[in-house]
Amino acid sequence: MFNRNYRTPLKLRHSNFGFRWQPMTPSRGRLRHNKPSASRKLSYDRVEREMRTNSIVEVQHGSHMSLEKNTDVSSFVQYPARGINGDGRCRDYIKLLKLDVSGVINIKSSNGDQDMEPGDKLSGLFILTVLLDKKPYLPEGVNKLPSFAELFGPYSAAYANMHLLDSQKPRFKVLGTIKKFVNCTPGTLYGPLKLNMPLSRRKCPLWTTFKDPDQGNCGGNYKNISKNAIVLSYAFISMHSLIVEPYFQFELKYVG
């Protein structure tokens, strides 16, 4: 408790005007404040910045994606990585805004044209399905995403309105579908395909979260996503010996 009767100790000091009693408390002007030394330690911590709107573009094509008749391939949309220099995303989560899909398919006969008559037709159905994987998961030692049959059942399901199997509905949601019916003479056919999908709305935003276990493992691949990955299902159905070579570009707009 403060004591009102307490007085600062005095000391008799000599000056040009004689002896005077002065308080023993040192003057503030005489105090010297030592500046802290600057840290010379190098820091490689992540640069934290404000979240901003950005986009990432990915192209999927190649021999590993070629489809023969009645086959399918599963893939995913790459998300931005989190870098120490501030590029890409700056948090372990992003807001998905929009996904633009564009590309072509190259269709050709797998057994050549020598067995085909000039008036013969080659027919088939190409399907690209974009799905939201709410809870991304791959068992230990498994690197293959769910196939068309595991998601929708037999290939014949593609001829009508496609619906997920009941066992997959809690985890997956269909965001959009591209269907291209092929009916061509022997040779090569290019079909331009486009799909634009808004992912977030004002009252219904869509967020994705990442595991980011350490600074060296903060990528945008499927295994590092803990919530809301985008899975792609390519499939081709035909009664003829055809090969489909897809070439698609995915442009993802996000806030992160």
Swiss-Prot record:
- What is the stated purpose of this protein? Binds to the genomic viral ssDNA, shuttles it into and out of the cell nucleus. Begomoviruses use 2 proteins to transport their DNA from cell to cell. The nuclear shuttle protein (NSP) shuttles it between nucleus and cytoplasm and the movement protein (MP) probably transports the DNA-NSP complex to the cell periphery and facilitates movement across the cell wall.
| Keyword Methyltransferase assigned | no
Mind telling me what this protein is named?
Nuclear shuttle protein
Q: Which GO terms describe its molecular function?
A: single-stranded DNA binding; structural molecule activity
Location of the region described as Interaction with Arabidopsis thaliana NSI protein in the Swiss-Prot/TrEMBL record: 150-187
Complexes and interactors: Binds to single-stranded and double-stranded viral DNA. Interacts with the host nuclear shuttle interacting (NSI) protein. This interaction may allow NSP to recruit NSI monomers to the viral genome and thus regulate nuclear export of viral genome by NSP.
What is the residue range of the motif Nuclear localization signal?
A: 81-96
GO terms under biological process: DNA transport; transport of virus in host, cell to cell
Q: What is its main location?
A: host cell
Q: How does it sit in the membrane?
A: Peripheral membrane protein
